[in-house]
């Protein structure tokens, strides 16, 4: 892992959060390159190969954010924890930004975070401390077998962790009714819809 002063940036954009607990809130997004988890339904495959994306100085990344009217910064991927995020978070905090992480939890934690959204993947499950640190658990549901996977993960997070089931986008119309019925029977869960896709924004 590098010292984190340069990071492979796939894209940066200012938009609204579209998933989970903070849906609808304005935020600046930083998508980092590199992911070896390989989810079949991934909607950001273009981010997987880190070599395809230029390394940028963290100072330049942070400087750009000052042009936008938000105090919230979401770091996503790819799998952002492939990289040392300590320096990025330090610089964001110096600029009074709130830091949000979207991760599979498969790699060691780095960085200082105000909110961690853990989205576990079966083919590369989270490490133990990811469960301990998660503020939000978001499980992608492709079919009914994923409800048991969701419950396995729920048992590992903190009691106050927010719990979300999110339909896999290509099957959204098929799987939403199943999620609705599941939540009616298991009301500790909430549904997360990818609102940004409905709004056709990044």
Residue ranges and their predicted role:
Residues 1-4:
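Radical SAM enzyme core and accessory elements
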Residues 81-202:
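Conserved AdoMet/S-adenosylmethionine-binding subsite of the radical SAM
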